[in-house]
Amino acid sequence: MALTLFSRRATARSLGSCTTIRAFSTPVNDTFPPSPSAPPPPPEASHVLRNAVSAQGTRYNWTRDEIRDIYNTPLMELAFQSATLHRRFHRPSAIQMCTLMNIKTGGCSEDCSYCAQSSRYNTGLTATKMSSVDSVLEAARIAKSNGSTRFCMGAAWRDMRGRKTSLKNVKSMIEGVRAMDLEVCVTLGMIDQAQAEDLAQAGLTAYNHNLDTSREHYPSVISTRTYDERLQTLSHVRQAGINVCSGGILGLGETPEDHVGLIHTVSTLPQHPESFPVNALVPIKGTPLGDKLPEGKRPIPFDAILRTIATARLTMPATIIRIAAGRTTMSEAEQILCFSAGANAVFTGEKMLTTEAVGWDTDKAMFEKYGLVPMKSFERGELRDMKGKLEASSWRDVKDAAEQDGKAVGLEL
């Protein structure tokens, strides 16, 4: 017996620590990996993030440090918290379909380093005169028949000085589009207070004038128009009672700190913009930025787009966040993540100014596949009665609650 025990011990030593000796059996080579450690606890949300998620209204005194703190939250936590807030202010499955038409192409005197419509760059684009009122209204009718509830018009020039005839035609376009019960937005460069008042009288819903990027990075992108001139145009628009549409372009060679700076600027305006477009650079050969980017390389990683959308939602809870240029590079799954995190509008149709757009049929198929519905005209974000609904045990519970809310205000989910 002693000899047998000694033999077993010797055998165990010879086989090493990786071998298991079973009583009354031959040794077997069972290798046991180290016991897995307990998963790390989920990151604790900062007090800034907690306060943002529990917001009862809009806030205009964000500090840059606070926005940076939100932006740098671990991405899964950031997207979850922005989705939670989004459902308190918006119908989660309602996405606005917008169509953008170029009513005057090319020939712009500015040097925006991303833009094909600048006369300074050789991009192969042919400048055109302004489209006729009738052709624009026909395009708006087609957009409406395909489900768009917002029709946007863009003209490539620096400002409206000396353009009395053009302004008159634009006002006729605005009046005609509004008669179709569509929201109408224009982007016409810089405008003064009198021009803003004229557009307001014509029934303009919103005026788009993007800030593009942070104040710090802006001089690297544009030299012919200052950041303060852009802010001045937004001030004229607000004072005229027109909704402000202002966002940025990601992929201009900026850093995450510039995303923070852009959001800080728009979220501390006297009023939050009615809508915040998030563009991803579409590189166009012949432009300075288009020539810098290697062929086939994505100008901005998707996680930066998602972080920007989520941070914008948490700091501007009632604002419509629009996925604009560059959506053709996103998969359906990426778009759905954006919608979940707080984006609730897309540009759809044949073209988006000079770049390709996701077509109406493609978007309709995506909406049907994922249970999305077109947002109604003039639907806006506001704090909704979600008492007890955020604690729902499943997505079905959340959707049922939102559907009841939609019926209560005469909307379809």
Question: What kind of region is each of these model predictions?
Answer:
Residues 18, 108, 112, 152, ...:
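Functionally engaged cysteine thiol sites
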Residues 72, 77-122, 128-154:
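N-terminal pre-triad scaffold of radical SAM enzymes
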Residues 100-103, 158, 186-188, 250-252, ...:
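Conserved short loop/turn motifs at secondary-structure junctions
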Residues 116-118, 216, 290-295:
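Short glycine/proline- and charge-enriched loop/turn segments
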